[in-house]
Amino acid sequence: MKKWFLVCLMFVTLLALADGHGDLGLEKRQPDAPMNVTSVVLGEDVTSVSAEGDMEGYGKVYVTYHLSYNAARTGGTVDGQGRGFTPDGYASGRFQGFWELVDGVVVMRNVVNITDNTMNLDVIKFNPLTRELVVQAYILK
């Protein structure tokens, strides 16, 4: 099952690497969501980035990204989870994907499985110089 998921994840990631997400015909789930980076923990094998912000449909969101490095240390895999809280309750999501360094910006592309039985392709851009982090969420399911 895990291998099947990784194969599907790689397929979706290859699509995400194409220029222009509009070309894929994916619809945005919500407006782009700027987040406040609350911590960056550097490690030899993994760096963790935590952020919080408001997202349409999910409320106040807290998320942590765990980035593992490739041999060149310019990309690798990413996994993590997030929680969103609204007056009506909460949602939880787990994600896996890949990241790369593009012109000094960390670009993550993740498949997100959310407890409300929805699935997103999230494209996250994190600029370590300015601490800007923006989440673009596209509907997969």
Regions found by a protein language model. Give the residues of each.
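Positively charged n-region of N-terminal signal peptides that target proteins for export
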Residues: 1-4
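Hydrophobic h-region of N-terminal signal peptides that target proteins for export
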Residues: 10-17
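Beta-strand-enriched cores of mature, soluble protein domains
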Residues: 18-141
